[in-house]
């Protein structure tokens, strides 16, 4: 066997430095922002007070006193950590109680809770496929979350990507399916676009073509539907598997899959992150359980009214916004990556925290500012955000004629 010709030796640090320089030259370098306060409407970010319009704490439950008290009480009675994975010592009564609460909340027979939302998708998809990759096709929306993309990859099934929310394209691909098992997967509310999947159409097409349906509604739960049960409640259709996260509207961390009892048993035995990850701490589980009880129609309505107000104000100022009207995610179109970074920096200088979203999170040349609202924002804070953003966009030549 011939040995590969070695490259001239450079240190790993030097190699990384070259790649980092190239990444930055494309306007793609990212930096962590340091918070000295919680995820509140006014937060201290990098040592400065700013209006926070970038948090996924949509309902403000991360700071809810009842939620915090639940976490404190759990720590005092059950300790700071779970002590093991779910199949060893890491399943407390609190874990099973939360899973039952989630199943009842969404009206599914069962629910399985994972350490993160990312792990929930990664492991649920691969567990459903199992060792049948050669006999399995996954049909995935082109703008699905990275955790879905990665889950489909490690499942080793054939992955077929359909155009974003184009269900004629999905049906055309389903009609040419060649493998016996199939799974149709989509985000519910798309995190970077603010658009919604057509869940009834997905469920109907999957059933018509002998496939299973799977929706990840991480950003829809707590923000959409009359009572905050998400995209599926809003549209009146429910998939075979509903995945979500506790790290957005519920103000905590962790992920879950709602499903039938046999699928739940499969996940508990074959979902690798469930089997091999230490389970969430008692504090997290208690906080999420309490937060779930705090989701109600009034809180959701308040959030949706804030979202509508910000959209209306931005449109009136000639700022291009996208997404579902009541969605808490408000993508503001920029296009050029470097210009998006400049706009985000100008917002920070004016006391508003809202990030530029660039490749690889969105396609090249489609950079956005991603605004998110919280139910805890006041009307005055929403108006201030709109006013400042409109002024910055006008200065950068990014405003459009008002129709």
Q: In which residue ranges do the predicted regions lie?
A:
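N-terminal "arm"/small-domain region of PLP-dependent enzymes with the aminotransferase-like
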Residues: 15-78, 211
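PLP-dependent enzyme catalytic core of the Aspartate aminotransferase-like
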Residues: 65, 69, 73, 77, ...
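Short loop-beta-helix segment that forms the pyridoxal 5′-phosphate
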Residues: 85-89, 99-123
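Conserved PLP-anchoring active-site segment centered on the Schiff-base-forming lysine
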Residues: 125-146
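Active-site phosphate-binding strand-loop segment of PLP-dependent enzymes
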Residues: 160-215
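Active-site PLP attachment segment
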Residues: 233-266
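Structural motif of enzymes handling amino- and sulfur-group chemistry
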Residues: 262, 279-296, 306, 316
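Conserved PLP-binding catalytic core of the aspartate aminotransferase-like
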Residues: 301-311, 315-350, 366, 373-375
């Amino acid at each position: 066997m011939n040995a590969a010709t070695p490259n001239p030796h450079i240190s790993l640090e030097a190699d990384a430095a070259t790649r980092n320089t190239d990444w930055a030259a494309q306007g793609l370098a990212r930096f962590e922002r340091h918070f000295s306060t919680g995820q509140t409407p006014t937060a201290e970010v990098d040592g400065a007070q700013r209006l926070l319009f970038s948090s996924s704490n949509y309902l403000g439950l991360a700071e809810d006193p009842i939620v915090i008290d639940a976490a404190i009480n759990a720590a005092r009675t059950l300790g700071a950590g779970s002590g093991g994975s779910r199949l060893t010592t890491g399943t407390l009564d609190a874990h099973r109680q939360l899973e039952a609460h989630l199943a009842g909340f969404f009206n599914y027979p069962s629910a399985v809770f994972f350490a993160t939302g990312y792990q929930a998708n990664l492991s649920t998809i691969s567990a459903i496929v199992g060792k049948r990759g050669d006999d399995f096709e996954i049909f995935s929306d082109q703008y699905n979350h990275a955790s879905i993309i990665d889950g489909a990859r490690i499942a080793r099934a054939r992955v077929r990507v359909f155009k974003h929310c184009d269900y004629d394209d999905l049906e055309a691909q389903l009609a040419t399916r060649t493998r016996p098992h199939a799974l149709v997967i989509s985000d519910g509310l798309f995190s970077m676009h603010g658009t919604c999947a057509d869940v009834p159409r997905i469920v109907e097409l999957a059933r018509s073509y002998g496939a299973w349906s799977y929706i990840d509604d991480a950003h829809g739960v707590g923000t959409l539907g009359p009572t905050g049960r998400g995209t599926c409640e809003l549209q009146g259709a429910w998939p075979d598997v509903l995945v979500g996260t506790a790290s957005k509207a519920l103000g905590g961390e962790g992920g879950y899959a709602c499903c039938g009892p046999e699928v739940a048993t499969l996940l508990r035995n074959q979902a690798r992150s469930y089997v091999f990850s230490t389970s969430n701490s008692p504090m997290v589980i208690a906080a999420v359980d309490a937060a779930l009880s705090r989701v109600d129609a009034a809180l959701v309505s308040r959030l949706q009214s804030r979202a509508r107000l910000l959209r209306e104000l931005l449109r009136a100022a000639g700022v291009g916004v996208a997404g579902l009207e009541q969605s808490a995610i408000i993508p503001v179109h920029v296009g050029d990556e470097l210009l998006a970074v400049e706009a985000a920096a100008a917002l920070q200088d004016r006391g508003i925290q809202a990030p530029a979203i660039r490749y690889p999170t969105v396609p090249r040349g489609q950079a956005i500012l991603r605004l998110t609202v919280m139910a805890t924002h006041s009307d005055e804070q929403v108006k201030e955000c709109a006013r400042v953003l409109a002024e910055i966009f006008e200065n950068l030549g990014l405003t459009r004629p008002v129709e």
